[in-house]
Every structure is written in C-alpha cells, then in structure tokens.
Amino acid sequence: MSGTRASNDRSSHPGAGGHKRPRYDVGNKVTVILGAQWGDEGKGKVVDLLATDSDIICRCQGGNNAGHTVVVEGKEYDFHLFPSGIINPKAISFIGNGVVIHLPGLFEEADKNEKKGLKDWEKRLIISDRAHIVFDFHQAVDGLQEVQRQAQEGKNIGTTKKGIGPTYSSKASRTGLRICDLLSDFDEFSARFKNLAHQHQSMFSNLEVDVEGQLKKLKMYAEKIRPMVRDGVYFMYEALHGSPKKILVEGANAALLDIDFGTYPFVTSSNCTVGGVCTGLGIPPQNVGDVYGVVKAYTTRVGIGAFPTEQINEIGNILQTRGHEWGVTTGRKRRCGWLDLVILRYAHMINGFTALALTKLDILDVLDEMKIGVAYRLNGKRIPYFPANQEILQKVEVEYEVMPGWKSDTTGARKWEDLPTRAQNYIRFVENHIGVPVKWVGVGKSRESMIELF
C-alpha cells in the first residue's frame, strides 16, 4: 500500500499541486559580429568598438587564417587567432572549441603584439580544451594540396596555407587531436600524433615530418598553455548564467566563405554564419542576442571564384588603391567591385541580422556615380535567389541601381548630419532594400571614424 501512497503523493512531483515548475532563465545573451560578404569587411573595427565595454570576447570558428587589424592610439595590432578584444585589459578573451589552433602561430602572434605594447595577455586568455590542434604537417599538406589542385584542374582554392582545411578534415574524419589530448597522457598523445603524421605521409609521398622534433615542441607548448585551458562548455555556461555580463562573439571569415552557405568550393572549412556560434562555443540558440552584419560599402574578394559585381576596370582600380585592398593574412591583392545587395540579402536570410555596420564609405568619396547590384538575371530572366552552383553564378548578369556620387570628403564626419545627402541616400537605399537598419557607418581607420546612428 505504501508504494501506492507514494505515487499518489503529488508533492513528490515537481510542478504538481501547488509547486511551480522551475522557470528556465535564458541568462545573458551574446552579441555576435559576422562578415556579410567574402571577408575583409572591417569586423575587427566593430568588435573593437564593442569590446571596450565587454566582459568576455569569444572566437568560435576558424583559425589563424583570419586577419583582423585594430588601430589603438595610433598603433596597428594584427590579430589572427586571438580575439581582437585581447587589447582590452579588463576583458577575458575566449577561444572556443570550434576554433583550430596552431600553437606556434599563437605564440608568434603574441610576441609580435607584445612588441607593440600588448601586456599580460596570458592572464586574460582562456582556451577551450575541446579545440582541435593545427600541426605543422597540416600546414605543409595545405600547400601540397594547392599545388596538386593547380596541376590537376589548373586552378586552386586560394587557401591561406595555414592548415585550416586539413585540420577540419582530420576533425571530421575523427583522427584529429585536441588541446585536452595534448594536456593528458603525453605517451598516448604521441602515439596518436605519430599515426596521424604517418596517415598524411601515406597520402603525400613527399611530405616530411620530423615527428620527434615536433613532439618535443608540442610538449613545451603544452606547459605554456596549460594555465589557460578550461572546459569550454562549463566556462560558457557560467558566463551565461552568472552575474550579468556583456559577451561578444567575433566571427572570422564571412557568410560567403561558409562551408555550407558560401560559394563552395571557394570557401573556408568552418561555419562562419550564426550557427557556428552555437556549435563553436557550446551555447544554445536562445542565448544569441543581437547579430550584427558587417558589410563594406563596395565588395571585395580574395582568390578565385565567381564575383558577379567585380569591376576589372578603372573603378576596380580606384577601389583597390583607395581602399588599400590587400589581404591581412596573405598580402594578396583583393578583387573589387560594386556593392551587391543580392549577397547581402542572402547573408541576412541565414544570419538574421538585427543591424548592419556599413564600412569604408569614404572610399567612394571620389566617384561620379555609384552602382548597387539589386538583382541577378540568368538568360535574361530575373532569378529570385542566390545560385548555389558556381558555374551558374559565373553566368549571372547583375541588375544595377545607379546613384549619383557625393564627390566630397566624408572622413571628417562624426555624426549622421555631417554626411552629404547623397551619402545618406546610399545608406538608406541599402537599409530599405535589405530591411535591416544600419547602426554604424565607417568613414576612416580610427575608432572615432565609426559613426553610430542609433
């Protein structure tokens, strides 16, 4: 009888009788900054603005293939693997599980920036124990694969040769090694490292790996990073559910470089759209707050692949030279063209931008007129989508809206009213076409030249 009584005793059931079910509190939300084109939109600059009053700044995907330049007090800092918020002495920088880490690259980057004045970074950096490691042979393989592609197809992907793709390949084929493996039993790690190296050598006959030399270095790096490593899932959970905190997520690469949604195969090997934030940090979607898309006032692309609004002419040259369009990571000349709103709308469909940052508006100051790509035509017919297939994307014709240039210097503008009416019209046109407000307009290199509109 006692068993029945227990089962009828409503008080033993949470939520039964007079007891309220525990209400799930969402906790703090993260603010996300993502590239809305092919990268190099100026994400670092927006991060820098928001990082000054953030408590935690996170990276969730990619590796040191990203390049962010931040100018503080006249000093230019270059970040590849570090969140660019590492400059903020009051904030914690977190490298999430979705990031792939080349340890020599991490310390080289630290040294370079220390020489410029970065202090105590190791006290502010936390690394997820689940992040995968980029080995030197991954980088070598990256280069060898590119040579192979060039020989077989006469074209390459335009990789940064930082070993990112091969590392994500190891991760997907479940042979990769993580930070937690490096910090556990080193004999076990060494055995798995040797297997992984041999596996790559069997695929690439001319790949040389100094296994013992590498392991010696890795053992040294293990001790250097040990104090910085935490279980990333628990770290993020505490950050979200502890005291109120401002948490910023700095996306690397951009929407059209996303492994799923980008211009495949000319993409990177991770998700650089909003989904990568959840998988790369181990947080639920309800903790994603504002998502800011960063878009340049024109379009650039590094390496090969379709680029519908590209201008291989005087306009392209003006944008390239005025915009100093050279890659931070590769030093390669960027291809330039008109602003493409088909791409921007597509990026918004995937990411759900709550607002945009429109950067480098000042580069357009000298132009007599501007064109904005508003639709694609295929065989003379308007198509209502962004084509997935690269051969089709190569064939589209762009429908342009032509707008008169403002022909005046905007670099001194610090508020909306300082901008010429025609520049204001250009911005409003973008907002109305995409249906997302522009929150910042960039008219120069410094922090002060980001005009905040609301």
Curated annotation (Swiss-Prot):
This is Adenylosuccinate synthetase isozyme 1 A. HAMAP family: Adenylosucc_synth, Adenylosucc_synth_vert_basic. Component of the purine nucleotide cycle (PNC), which interconverts IMP and AMP to regulate the nucleotide levels in various tissues, and which contributes to glycolysis and ammoniagenesis. Catalyzes the first committed step in the biosynthesis of AMP from IMP. Substrate binds at residues 40, 328-334. Binds 1 Mg(2+) ion per subunit. Signal peptide: none annotated. Belongs to the adenylosuccinate synthetase family. Keywords: Cytoplasm, GTP-binding, Ligase, Magnesium, Metal-binding, Nucleotide-binding, Purine biosynthesis. Mg(2+) binds at residues 40, 67. The active site is at residues 40, 68. The gene is adss1-a. NCBIfam families: PRK01117.1, purA. It comes from Xenopus laevis (African clawed frog).
